[in-house]
């Protein structure tokens, strides 16, 4: 964006072809000046924690860039039998983020790439206490084999989450994992009500 150097771009990379995704991530960061890549929370043939995607995370760690996981892909989540859309949208954002984070913990993504930085976006923060509680129970049962306590994966500087100031769960989440992982989400460049868009942004050129 030419409007301000404070705006940074994230690349969309072809996750269906991991070698091409690695090459595109490298090009986006080293040639185009982007700061990372956005990938879908679900909808791929395999979970984001599948080994075939690990070269992407390895490259992101090597480049010291971020990976953003975006909620909102409603496929294969059981919403196809809902009779109204609001329930799909309400759950379709946080649920796949919870699934993605769970897989990345239990399948060892962060154990393999401890400096990988991942942001979980558009799903709020309410899902975080739930999976921490549930996964800690699995660790206590001896069924979840991780190199660290579950909470550490949220507080080590690798995990980030987009949040909104009016979330009821936000204060509890901050008490649980601290404020550092929480990023205020403006949802720029779109807004549900155009009158709320600051006048200074109306002239932004892409």
Which residues does each PLM region occupy?
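His/Asp/Glu-enriched, well-ordered alpha-helical/loop segment
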Residues: 180-206
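Catalytic donor nucleotide-activated moiety binding site of glycosyltransferases and closely related
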Residues: 11-13
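Short histidine/acidic/glycine/proline-rich micro-motifs that form metal-
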Residues: 15, 43-44, 189-190
């Amino acid at each position: 964006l030419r409007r301000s150097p404070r705006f940074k771009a994230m690349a969309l990379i072809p996750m269906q072809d991991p070698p091409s995704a690695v090459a595109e991530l490298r090009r986006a960061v080293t040639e185009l000046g982007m700061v990372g890549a956005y990938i879908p929370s679900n909808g791929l043939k395999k979970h984001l924690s599948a080994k075939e995607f690990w070269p992407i995370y390895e490259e992101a760690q090597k480049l010291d860039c971020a990976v953003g996981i975006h909620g909102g892909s409603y496929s294969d989540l059981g919403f196809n039998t809902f009779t109204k859309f609001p329930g799909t949208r309400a759950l379709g954002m946080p649920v796949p983020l919870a699934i993605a984070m769970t897989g990345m913990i239990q399948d060892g993504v962060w154990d393999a790439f401890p400096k990988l930085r991942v942001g979980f976006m558009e799903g709020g923060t309410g899902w975080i206490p739930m999976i921490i509680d549930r996964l800690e129970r699995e660790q206590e049962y001896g069924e979840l084999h991780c190199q660290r306590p579950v909470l550490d994966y949220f507080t080590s500087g690798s995990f980030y989450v987009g949040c909104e100031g009016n979330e009821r769960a936000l204060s509890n989440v901050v008490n649980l994992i601290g404020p550092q992982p929480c990023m205020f989400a403006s949802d720029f460049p779109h807004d549900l009500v155009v009158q709320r868009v600051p006048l200074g942004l109306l002239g932004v050129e892409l």
